[in-house]
């Protein structure tokens, strides 16, 4: 685990990504999260295991390119994001949608 996130693992995970593809992956016990773009795989694994009390068996990460945005005549870039697909051990799950 890198020193950057050692004391604050909750800052690694930004939010779960709920898309059509990510929802299909839930059946395979794979969860998709948006994470800090500086986070390494050991940071992500430690954060998921500590926050959700589950066993992680694998992580795939991707850094999609930044997209350009325009506001009138001003051009800019969106913030850098990193996606992580986390595979959990059999029998483990994360409750993304609270039951009422």
From Swiss-Prot:
GO terms for molecular function: rRNA binding; structural constituent of ribosome. InterPro entries: Nucleotide-bd_a/b_plait_sf (IPR012677), Ribosomal_uL23-like (IPR013025), Ribosomal_uL23/eL15/eS24_sf (IPR012678), Ribosomal_uL23_CS (IPR001014). Keywords: Ribonucleoprotein, Ribosomal protein, RNA-binding, rRNA-binding. PROSITE patterns: RIBOSOMAL_L23 (PS00050). GO terms for biological process: translation. It comes from the Bacteria. GO terms for cellular component: ribonucleoprotein complex; ribosome. The keyword RNA-binding applies. Belongs to the universal ribosomal protein uL23 family. Part of the 50S ribosomal subunit. Contacts protein L29, and trigger factor when it is bound to the ribosome. One of the early assembly proteins it binds 23S rRNA. One of the proteins that surrounds the polypeptide exit tunnel on the outside of the ribosome. Forms the main docking site for trigger factor binding to the ribosome. This is Large ribosomal subunit protein uL23. It comes from Synechococcus sp. (strain CC9902).
């Amino acid at each position: 685990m890198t020193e950057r996130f050692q004391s604050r693992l909750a800052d690694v995970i930004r939010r779960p990504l709920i898309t059509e593809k990510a929802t299909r992956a839930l059946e395979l016990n794979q969860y998709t999260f948006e994470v800090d773009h500086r986070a390494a795989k050991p940071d992500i694994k430690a954060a998921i295991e500590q926050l959700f009390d589950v066993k992680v068996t694998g992580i795939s990460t991707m850094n999609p390119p930044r997209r350009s945005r325009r506001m009138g005549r001003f051009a800019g870039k969106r913030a850098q994001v990193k996606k992580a697909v986390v595979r959990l051990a059999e029998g483990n799950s994360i409750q993304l949608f609270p039951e009422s």
